[in-house]
Design a protein with these regions (language model features):
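Carboxylate-rich, polar loop motifs that coordinate divalent cations or form catalytic acidic clusters
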Residues: 1-189
Length: 189
């Protein structure tokens, strides 16, 4: 009887201790509903700046989340933001339907949008939706399914591609393009 009581006490002690401990390798998950961030139901792209602030391309615009507060930054056209990329200079580049540019903080620490679309001289937009943004060879690259746009910090050059880029992937300093009905290509200067 004493042994049974001792075993029962030991078992009870260990089981109560194990309930209070966390499960190893179990990620902490926090869900955010549409009512938390007060924007569209679809999120298309996510990136994070060097301060830890998250930027999310959303149906209603660019969402900014500092870990506590959400803020929506709409494009002048109020279009969906499909792609988001943060440049080395801290600019937040965004892509949308026949629109692309960047948000930059002003002297009041508010985000202000600067369109780059009209900087693409001699380029006619035709259903160009910017799906991916990355950097290559010192330029920001905006990718739609029929065009690539290169921004060097001053000018924008738009080109129609012979093969249609489905997506861009960056590995180190090399940018790869998966082509629609094609193979994998390397974006060269």
């Amino acid at each position: 009887m004493r042994i049974s009581l001792l075993l029962f006490c030991i078992f009870s002690l260990f089981s109560s201790l194990s309930r209070g401990s966390s499960i190893p390798f179990s990620p902490i998950v926090r869900s955010y509903s549409v009512s938390d961030y007060n924007a569209g139901i679809q999120n298309w792209s996510i990136t994070q700046d060097d301060r830890g602030v998250m930027y999310i391309g959303n149906n209603k615009g660019l969402l900014e989340f500092d870990g506590n507060n959400w803020e929506l930054h709409e494009l002048p056209s109020k279009n969906i933001v499909r792609s988001v990329y943060i440049g080395k200079d801290g600019k937040i580049f965004v892509g949308s339907f026949e629109e692309f540019g960047y948000f930059e903080r002003n002297s009041l620490d508010s985000l202000v949008y600067h369109s780059l679309k009209d900087e693409a001289k001699d380029f006619r937009f035709h259903n160009d939706e910017i799906w991916t943004i990355t950097s290559a060879h010192g330029e920001i690259v905006f990718q739609s399914f029929g065009s690539l746009f290169f921004y060097d910090g001053h000018t924008v050059k738009g080109i129609r591609t012979k093969t249609l880029p489905l997506n861009l992937f960056q590995v180190g300093d090399t940018v790869y393009s998966q082509q629609i009905n094609g193979g994998l290509f390397i974006l060269a200067k």
